């Protein structure tokens, strides 16, 4: 016997339609590429998203066509999120931090028909345009007054296109499993792979993001996503914002400490999200200038492991709660979030920080397990470690244009490539990427554990640990650090810092001090580059 409930399709257009009806006067504030602060409402966003859909239709874009964006977090970008997907095309966000050769590969692999770009990235687009096989037009996301001169013949002005359209476009109704957006993995080992999200998966993920135990979005909150809209759809937050009526503040290209602090204070931001590298810079700015953001209550940190020193700094120095999140492009991306249980909030600082450096508990909708090398499920005792596998309604089952290649195991689990433990309370803790584990004398050494310890040294800004060949032990850990301004510790001081904190045999044999660590397009240290230099 089946239930007697209506069967309504879960479509991205329904999110902004809801936001415009229920929270019509809620604000969206953007720092623009052109400079000024821009303000408008959810109702304005809905109307202009319909104009985008009308403009795309007039340009000949059809259902399933891919439309690429190369843009910062801003109001025009979010209009494309809803306008492109709402008219049944696929919104394909591009990461401008990737190497031009990777962008060329991605655009050609996706067969994008149009490319929307912020003014910032027009020189990059001009440099690669001649190698793009399917792009018919390039739209600059600005108005006529700011349109630049360009050698490109197929250049269009965003605001001119919208001015030719009314806001009476009717959102079509279609299958919720239709493709909505496309993101490519960073491709550190080979070409990037496309992850194709559906309307259904995106809406379900938005429900998850909005939960009190995840990002706690609501009409009483003001949220600023530092995480880019070109990185896994800004962790799904643009879809959750109109669902919940949360005020949205977008930083545009200005991600330095001064700009973020000024904007957060001006708009009374209560929560934010981003990668550790951004927060490291922000913390240093606050300390150097004796400032902060008094309204900020919570920061969601993901993308790479959060150093214990960062959790402690936000808490003790500024009274801000850190919630570590974990996920991956193939998971839309959120899989777990670390929100303390009520009884843990009153625990001593040391105990709380021990918990907060873990990646957290699975969100509803995501199942997790760890397995050994033979695929046998391991116990959730906080000690056994194995490969982390996941499954759920917003987890990818295949890569774009590679549908025939097996990704899932025989029971439908996705292999993450992470090594983790899970304890009895469900807290998952990633000990390393499988490819980053160091095997020394038959024993495994976690590079993440050593990196987090190094980051707690008062002189260290960033740290990475890689395995380098060793005749006796097969591999030994090498510590590579970027120091804070003015710091000059000795090698002995840095290596001695590990004494008593980890087993002696896992302490790195040497340390290299560098001006900069190689950072990839998603804000993570590129260990493949470090291995080329030192291993």
Model-derived segments and spans:
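Conserved AMP-binding/adenylate-forming core of the ANL superfamily
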Residues: 28-74, 78-82, 99-104, 154-160
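A short helix-loop-beta submotif of the ANL/AMP-binding
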Residues: 66, 72-92, 96-100, 108-114, ...
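Conserved AMP-binding/adenylation subdomain of ANL enzymes
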Residues: 203-222, 232-270, 285
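Gly/Ser/Thr-rich phosphate-binding loop
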Residues: 243, 266-274, 283-354, 367, ...
């Amino acid at each position: 016997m089946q239930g007697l409930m209506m069967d309504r399709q879960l479509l991205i257009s329904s999110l902004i339609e809801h936001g415009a009806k229920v929270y019509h006067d809620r604000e969206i504030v953007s720092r623009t590429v052109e400079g000024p602060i821009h303000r408008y409402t959810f109702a304005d966003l809905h109307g202009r998203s319909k104009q985008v859909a009308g403009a795309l239709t007039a340009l000949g874009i059809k259902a399933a066509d891919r439309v690429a964006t190369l843009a910062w977090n801003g109001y025009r970008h979010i209009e494309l999120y809803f306008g492109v997907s709402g008219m049944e095309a696929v919104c394909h966000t591009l990461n401008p931090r990737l190497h031009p050769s990777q962008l060329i590969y991605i655009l050609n692999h996706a067969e994008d028909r149009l490319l929307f770009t912020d003014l910032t990235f027009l020189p990059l687009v001009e440099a690669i345009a001649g190698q793009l096989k399917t792009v018919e037009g390039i739209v600059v996301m600005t108005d006529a007054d700011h349109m630049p001169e360009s050698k490109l013949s197929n250049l269009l002005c965003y605001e001119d296109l919208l001015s030719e359209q009314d806001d009476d476009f009717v959102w079509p109704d279609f299958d919720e499993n239709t493709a909505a957006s496309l993101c490519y993995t960073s491709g550190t080992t080979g070409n990037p792979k496309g992850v194709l999200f559906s309307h259904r998966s995106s809406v379900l993920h938005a429900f998850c993001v909005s939960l009190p135990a995840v990002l706690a979005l609501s009409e009483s909150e003001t949220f600023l996503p530092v995480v880019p809209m070109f990185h896994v759809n800004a962790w799904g937050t643009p879809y959750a914002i109109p669902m919940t009526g949360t005020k949205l503040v977008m930083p545009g290209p200005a991600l330095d400490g001064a700009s973020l602090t000024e904007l957060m204070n001006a708009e009374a931001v209560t929560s934010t999200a981003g990668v550790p590298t951004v927060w490291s810079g922000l913390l240093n700015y606050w300390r150097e200038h004796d400032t902060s953001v008094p309204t900020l209550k919570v920061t969601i940190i993901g993308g790479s492991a959060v150093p214990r020193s960062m959790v402690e700094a936000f808490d003790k120095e500024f009274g801000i709660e850190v919630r570590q999140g974990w996920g991956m492009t193939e998971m839309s991306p959120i899989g777990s979030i670390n929100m303390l249980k009520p009884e843990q909030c009153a625990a001593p600082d040391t105990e709380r920080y021990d918990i907060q450096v873990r990646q957290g508990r699975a969100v509803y909708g995501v199942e997790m397990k760890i397995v050994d090398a033979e695929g046998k499920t391991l116990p959730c005792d906080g000690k056994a470690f194995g490969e982390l596998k996941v499954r759920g309604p917003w987890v990818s089952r295949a890569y774009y244009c590679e549908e025939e290649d097996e990704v899932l195991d025989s029971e439908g689990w996705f292999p993450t490539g992470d090594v983790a433990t899970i304890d009895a309370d469900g807290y998952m803790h990633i000990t390393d990427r499988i490819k980053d584990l160091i095997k020394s004398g038959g024993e495994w050494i976690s590079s993440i554990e050593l990196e987090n310890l190094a980051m707690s040294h008062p002189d260290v800004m960033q740290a990475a640990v890689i395995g380098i060949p060793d005749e006796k032990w097969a591999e030994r850990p090498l510590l590579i650090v970027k120091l804070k301004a003015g710091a000059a510790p000795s090698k002995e001081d840095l290596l001695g810092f590990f004494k008593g904190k980890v087993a002696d045999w896992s302490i790195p044999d040497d340390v290299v001090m560098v001006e900069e660590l190689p950072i990839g397009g998603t804000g993570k240290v590129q260990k493949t580059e470090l291995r080329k230099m030192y291993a």
